Amino acid sequence: MILYIFITTLTIALGCFVKNSRCMQTGQFGNPYVRNYHITNNGNTPKTKQTVQITSYKKNHITRRQGQNALCLFAIFIILFLLSALRLEVGNDYGTYVDTIHEIYVGGYVVTEPLFNAVSKLLCELSGGENYLLVFGFFGFITIWLFLKILYEQTENFAMAFFLFMTLGLYFRTFNTVRYYFALAIALYSYRYVLKKEYVKFVLLIAVTALFHKSVLVVIPLYLIANYTWKKWQIAIMGMGAVGLVIFQDLVMKIALELYPSYKNTIYLENGEGVLGNVLSIGRCVAVLILALLCYKEAVEDNKANQFYFKLNLMSIALYICASFLPLVGRIVYYLMSSHILFIPSILGQIKNEKKKKVLQILVVTAGVLYFLLFLKTATQDGVRVLPYKSWLFYEKEFLNAGEIF
């Protein structure tokens, strides 16, 4: 736990030095600089002197700010990547993945998606033998890089977005179900295509990602619905649909198991998550809803991206309450509520009243710290199990039995 607190504090401190300006977000290399040209009028009129400012960009010039950003981002990436890649027996399904990678390597039967299988097989072949550590490291590298890219390019306040990424536990959860969190990172990246209404690119990207984790396919209808301007009668239909999930639970469950048969006859069906099992996540969504409503006029109403995030949050609450009977409904909702790391900084950035902005920032930071402490308290429980942390640097044991309890 102390290690996680230290890593979180260190990386957040580094993140505070990253300033992602609009110029950088649009891909311009070099901040604008100004040259002053003095023009003197020597005509018949009295002599005058004017100064003309010409703003331009040096495309191949790296400014001090960009250098600082690059250095801090690189340091953050290395710290987070090493913590992920060096872990051993950390993660709720670590042993299951070890067994799966073994079966992939020897040509056995696995239920994982084809592109994940192909990449895992290739990595093992390149390393000269069965090497699940390399597979974990590879997906950790790509996933962390994607999240940092998203936070830098798709937010106006990297420091706040990264703070939420760490304190809401999203980074540490990537130690579990590496396929899922890789798919989640790409789903967040796809926001840029949804908001620009580049739907062909969006669908193609998600379709390819589904070859790593097919659950990501649910974002196609959900994101399209969230990006659509809702009319009152459509809201009524969606409300009836939410109620229908509760009334026709058995039918919905049957359809869900046909689409995802790997959950049949598993502990997930026996235990079920339920509303109480997701009370912390529901509370988080409600808190974000309250923040959005407090700033709706100035931060959400006329902001296309924030409208999109606002609807994703509403859908998260509805699914948590009305579809809690579904196995691992949290995985579906996480594709929606992970937008909080972009939504909250965007809301705060739109507030004009400095006093109100400062108060809300303090409340958000306080809530983030408390949420992180609650996350750490549950980090040893089944379904999370990212604590205690162990590294293969200090243990000779490499290969695990998937049925072993850590």
Where do the PLM segments sit?
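Terminal, non-globular segments
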Residues: 1-406
